[in-house]
Amino acid sequence: MAKNLTPSDAKLEITQIKGVIGAKQNQKATLRSLGLKRIGHTVVRNADAVTVGMLNTVPHLVNVEEAK
């Protein structure tokens, strides 16, 4: 999951693993800001401070891996 993330020059593969029904409004907005629209959707983002902060807001809704 998205635990112990720190900003770096790496790329992250972020996959939404749970839906947003019942999630708080700020969590829904965070997922949309990351570019995630549905369960199973994957995006690749830089591991900068902004992205890491967003991922720390929704660690229970996403799966994060380092992109190859």
UniProtKB/Swiss-Prot annotation:
Keywords: Ribonucleoprotein, Ribosomal protein. GO terms for molecular function: structural constituent of ribosome. GO terms for cellular component: cytosolic large ribosomal subunit. InterPro entries: Ribo_uL30_ferredoxin-like_sf, Ribosomal_uL30_bac-type, Ribosomal_uL30_CS, Ribosomal_uL30_ferredoxin-like. PROSITE patterns: RIBOSOMAL_L30 (PS00634). Gene3D superfamilies: Ribosomal protein L30, ferredoxin-like fold domain. It comes from the Bacteria. The keyword Iron does not apply. The keyword Translocase does not apply. One of its GO terms (biological process) is translation. Part of the 50S ribosomal subunit. Belongs to the universal ribosomal protein uL30 family. This is Large ribosomal subunit protein uL30. The gene is rpmD.
